[in-house]
């Protein structure tokens, strides 16, 4: 078979809808990166540096990430960066014999596994959304988003440790950490078979810049740096991340608003009678049967509102107050 035909059969592109509507589908931050910080980025850029292959990761950025992590047991050799958290996930699928994940989960795990031709195992979460008993061990990498995407619920520390104790490598995807406020990064003191992945896309309004980071053992970081592309994160993207971390209080205040809106929406949705999760992300998740879900999606499309559809229901990104009020109104009408 022609290699291009084989790729077309096993992999498929990640597609998004047009942005000609109220868009609450991709868990993007409703607030733009502040204009004055954009100006600061460009003031700090050195035009002469643009002509060179810039260090990735930038040592100064690693120092700022370590300060943000605020631990006393991590050093520069425990941190690296990726072209978005997605690149880190993609590379990890090349590093291990088999990838394991628990749907409903981040859809790109399956997309990436198929794209790279990796062996993978999908074992659904239990009915109460807990990690099931699964036969894994050395050679496996187990991807666990915490808070989970798309449901937003949080896995217990004991669930994560149960997988770690099997000897499998755990990729703990903390893309939504800032909206939850609790991390299991301290487990790195106890387990070498753990990597914590984070992103600047969500809380820091930098999805377009494609920058994430990974924290793990020195041994893993060395292996990851050998596998990833050289110069994988641009000079400009790294500068945006450094400026964001220098002004983290701005983003912490915005995160506080998003969390308050999330809790407000959860309270209202429960009163409306919707079955929702206890989301700790920047989104809410409503369980729905297929027929009801399709009717809701049709209703929202007619109102020029886009949300994300999953087999188990719909996920709604927390937007600005007026956007949240708009979709709450339509959900009430639909109910």
Swiss-Prot record:
Belongs to the class-II pyridoxal-phosphate-dependent aminotransferase family. Histidinol-phosphate aminotransferase subfamily. GO terms for molecular function: histidinol-phosphate transaminase activity; pyridoxal phosphate binding. The keyword Transferase applies. This is Histidinol-phosphate aminotransferase. Homodimer. Pathway: Amino-acid biosynthesis; L-histidine biosynthesis; L-histidine from 5-phospho-alpha-D-ribose 1-diphosphate: step 7/9. Its cofactor is pyridoxal 5'-phosphate. The keyword Hydrolase does not apply. Keywords: Amino-acid biosynthesis, Aminotransferase, Histidine biosynthesis, Pyridoxal phosphate, Transferase. SUPFAM superfamilies: PLP-dependent transferases (SSF53383). One of its GO terms (biological process) is L-histidine biosynthetic process. Its EC number is 2.6.1.9. It catalyses: L-histidinol phosphate + 2-oxoglutarate = 3-(imidazol-4-yl)-2-oxopropyl phosphate + L-glutamate. The modification N6-(pyridoxal phosphate)lysine is found at residue 202. Pfam families: Aminotran_1_2. PROSITE patterns: AA_TRANSFER_CLASS_2. CDD domains: AAT_like (cd00609). It is an enzyme of class 2 (transferase).
